[in-house]
C-alpha cells in the first residue's frame, strides 16, 4: 500500500466505521489533472443501498475538505464492493477461500503477471492461488489488484 493510500485510509476508516459500516477499502487513481477516489463500504447483514452511499459520501466529503490530503481536483465515489469485489487485505482473501479470483501483479512472477484461479488460502504474507491444478504462493505485497470473479450457475 502506498503512503498516500495509507494516509487516506487512516483518515477515512474511522469516518466509515463511525457510521456503522465496514470499511472495505479504497482506490485512488490519478488521471492527469483530475483524479478519482473510490471508497468501498460494506454491511454484511443488510447490504448497501444508494442511501448508505450518499450518507457516507456526505461525511467523507466533509472530512476530506477539512483534512485536504489530495492537492488536485478529484471525484469522490462511494459504493459497495459488489459481486466482483476488489480485495485489499489478507483477511479478505481468507474470507473468500474457495472463490474464483483475478489477480494482477506489479511484476511478473514465474513468467506471468495475471492469474485467474481459486483462492486456496493465506500462508503468512502469501496468497495461495490454484490455477489449472498448479499452486502459486503470491506475495501479498506484489499484488497490484485483485477481484473476486462471480460465478453464475
Swiss-Prot record:
Record flagged with keyword Ribonucleoprotein: no
Pfam families: DUF150_C, RimP_N
GO BP, sorted A to Z: ribosomal small subunit assembly; translation
GO cellular component terms, semicolon-separated: cytosol
Subcellular location, record wording: Cytoplasm
Keyword match Transport: no
Keywords: Cytoplasm, Ribosome biogenesis
Superkingdom of the organism of origin: Bacteria
Functional summary from the UniProt entry: Required for maturation of 30S ribosomal subunits.
Family: Belongs to the RimP family.
Protein name: Ribosome maturation factor RimP
Organism of origin: Marinobacter nauticus (strain ATCC 700491 / DSM 11845 / VT8) (Marinobacter aquaeolei)
Amino acid at each position: 500500500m502506498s503512503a498516500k493510500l495509507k494516509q487516506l485510509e487512516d483518515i477515512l476508516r474511522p469516518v466509515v466505521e463511525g457510521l456503522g459500516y465496514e470499511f472495505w477499502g479504497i482506490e485512488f487513481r490519478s488521471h492527469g489533472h483530475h483524479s478519482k477516489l473510490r471508497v468501498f463500504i460494506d454491511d454484511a447483514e443488510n447490504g448497501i443501498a444508494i442511501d448508505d452511499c450518499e450518507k457516507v459520501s456526505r461525511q467523507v466529503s466533509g472530512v476530506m475538505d477539512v483534512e485536504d490530503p489530495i492537492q488536485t481536483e478529484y471525484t469522490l465515489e462511494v459504493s459497495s464492493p459488489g459481486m466482483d469485489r476488489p480485495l485489499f487485505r489478507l483477511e479478505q482473501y481468507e474470507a473468500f477461500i474457495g472463490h474464483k479470483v483475478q489477480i494482477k501483479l506489479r511484476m511478473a512472477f514465474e513468467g506471468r503477471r495475471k492469474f485467474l484461479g481459486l483462492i486456496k488460502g493465506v500462508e503468512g504474507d502469501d496468497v495461495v492461488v490454484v490455477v489449472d491444478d498448479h499452486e502459486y504462493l503470491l506475495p501479498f505485497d506484489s499484488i497490484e489488484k485483485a477481484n473476486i470473479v462471480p460465478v453464475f450457475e
